[in-house]
Amino acid sequence: MTPFHRLSRFFRQAPSPPRTPITSNFPILDSAVKIEEERMPAFDRGLFYPVKLGDVFRSRYQVLSKLGFGANSTVWFCRDLHQHRYIALKIYIRSSEVNREVQVLKHLSSVKTNHPGSSLVRKMIEEFEITGPSGSHQCIVYEPLLTSLLHFQATLKPQSLPEDLLKGALQQLLLALDYLHSEAHVIHTDDSIFREWDTSEEAEPSPRKVDSSHTIYKSRPFHRKKGWSGFGMPLLSDFGEARLGDVHDGSIQPDIYRAPEVILGMSWTSKVDIWNVGALIWDLFEDHHLFDGRGPNGDHSDAHLLAEMIAMLGPAPLNFLRKAPQSRKYWDSNGRWKGAIEVPQCSLEDSEEYLEGENKKMFMQFVRKMLRWDPEERQSAPELLTDPWLIAQ
């Protein structure tokens, strides 16, 4: 061992002791009102690990506050007592099934690549299992991220990304998609912004519901400080629905972002993500969804969604429909729409409200390269990265 390494080991910081959590003077919420993960349609309290603020996992990760939740997990802001840094800890519900997200993240960790898009994909630090009252739970440790693009957008006035920021985000997203296909879009930041969350629980304890077996906390998401403008590259994250391989079957994607081939029961490839990018642009830039897809009762309807696609994109190509197992529910053998739903009077161009002239024309050409009925006609991520509108200053 060199003298330098002996010296660095001598000066290495010892692990920090766990902090004593707040045990009083926090807001108690009405036990009859459902909050957070309780509001998920298939919520089962017994499936979630009963995390408490102050808990320490693996003898090193102390829980400081709750960041968020989903149908299958909760996410916690933690202090790494060994390496004196902040991390995000995702704790999954109890399940006997192999966790798809863990599989994908392990695969990512094993990939050796110099592709620039790999740095734009969120990687896990480590994964482990813990045992709860009703079984085992898988856990993933990540670097914490500041916020999602959509939450960042909500802080803007008006609530739409400026064109230059949209272009930058799309370039990074497409570069990451060229390396790996995913859905969630988040903004990354350095460690300094997290320091005030370290002590925020002491200054303003999280509201919570408490009973003898389980405490449910209100999330404390990160927010930009007033006047703070420092943020890093957007990262792709959340691989819970990611797939390994090239061709798949089955239903995927949230209703309003679902690609035509998925709706019509066809096999699908990475081109479903290109469709997602095209649809997501409206959320980020136009401040509204491109498609609605709801019937008169407010519930999702594939027929209404397909009718909107016809209005926005034009008629579906006959050669595409002939490959779609479920197309005869909505079209006749000649490709004429026979759905009971009338095609609405709207267009893709009319739904874009901010651009004008040649710039709008170029933007619409860019979008139409992604929003194509036939996935084989959608451009790939590398092709889209050279689009004239995207690279124009």
Curated annotation (Swiss-Prot):
User: What is the role of this chain?
Assistant: Serine/threonine protein kinase; part of the subtelomeric hrmA-associated cluster (HAC) containing genes that alter the hyphal surface (such as reduced total chitin or increased beta-glucan exposure) and perturb inter-hyphal interactions within the developing biofilms, resulting in a loss of vertically aligned polarized growing filaments. Consequently, this hypoxia-typic morphotype (called H-MORPH) with altered biofilm architecture leads to increased hypoxia fitness, increased host inflammation, rapid disease progression, and mortality in a murine model of invasive aspergillosis.
Q: Which residues bind ATP?
A: L67, G68, F69, G70, A71, N72, S73, T74, V75, K90
- Induction statement: Expression is regulated by the hypoxia responsive morphology factor A (hrmA).
Q: Protein name, please?
A: Serine/threonine protein kinase AFUB_078980
Entry keywords, A to Z: ATP-binding, Cell adhesion, Kinase, Nucleotide-binding, Serine/threonine-protein kinase, Transferase, Virulence
Domain of life according to the entry: Eukaryota
Keyword Transferase tagged: yes
Entry EC no(s): 2.7.11.1
Instruction: State any GO CC term.
Output: cytoplasm
What family does this chain come from, according to its entry?
Belongs to the protein kinase superfamily. CMGC Ser/Thr protein kinase family.
Q: What span is annotated as the signal peptide, if there is one?
A: none
| Catalytic reaction(s) noted | L-seryl-[protein] + ATP = O-phospho-L-seryl-[protein] + ADP + H(+); L-threonyl-[protein] + ATP = O-phospho-L-threonyl-[protein] + ADP + H(+)
Give start and end of each Protein kinase domain: 61-390
**Top EC group:** transferase
**Active site (catalytic residues):** D190 (proton acceptor)
Indicate whether Cell division appears among the record's keywords: no
The molecular function GO annotations come to: ATP binding; protein serine/threonine kinase activity
The record's annotation in InterPro entries points to: Kinase-like_dom_sf, Prot_kinase_dom, Protein_kinase_ATP_BS, SRPK
Biological processes annotated in GO: cell adhesion; regulation of mRNA processing; spliceosomal complex assembly
